[in-house]
Amino acid sequence: ALELRPFTRFTIAKSLDDLTNNKLSELMNSIIRDRSTGCFMIGPKNITSKINDTFLVKLSTAIAHLIGVPNHDAMTGKYYARFQVKHEDSSDSYLRKAYRNMDLHTDGTYVKEVTDWLIMTKIDEQNVEGGETAMLHLDDWEHCDDLYEDPVGKQNFVWGSPKSKNIDYKVEHPVFSSDKEGRPTISYIDQFPEPQNMEQGNFLQRLSDGLEESKNKIVTKLPVGYSVIANNYFWLHGRK
């Protein structure tokens, strides 16, 4: 029903919130919109046979719809993306590659839809070493002021995507913008910008180096059944 009847996604969200007398939605929305936090993890105390992929899709759907309306995912053709990271992979991006870091980035850099926040859920894990989740808050980043104040970061960059994303257009937007209070926000991923000149190319290299060398990254093992929910304007995420 969740796949074919969109209104049931709100029904399941309300059912979850009703279990907490609407306190869950209030708490999650206060965290996700607060610049000093903007991110949280949620998961079960114990994994049982009932916490399977079907349950986790339902739970993630409910959480997402208590915060907003998810963007359509063109890669999978659904209201959510689901993929496997495998031992062998021949795809055209880092997303499914087990033995490559996925550098710090934000989501939605190459689509027209606005991406305010994201939810990532680990449904299953077998025969795995490493693969930790990496996170970085923009206000904790040592190089933020330097790069934010560089005028190149405010230029429009061209952003494309590989064929697997099923997006047949390109977009233009700057790497850095600001919120209503004038604080930095970022929209960036290393794989998809198409620099138009030396100035933009060198700026992106400085940006990439500065993010990956940050001493303030949070690197944590995300257990099976757990989700990370993050504000997409000032939290970057990756995989190590």
Residue ranges and their predicted role:
Residues A1-L19, D34-S36, R82-V224, I229, ...:
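Active-site environment of non-heme Fe oxygenases that use a 2-His-1-carboxylate facial triad
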Residues S49-K97, N101-D103, M120:
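Long, hydrophobic, well-ordered secondary-structure blocks that form the structural core
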Residues A1-V69, L222, S227:
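N-terminal auxiliary "cap/dimerization" subdomain that precedes the catalytic jelly-roll/cupin core
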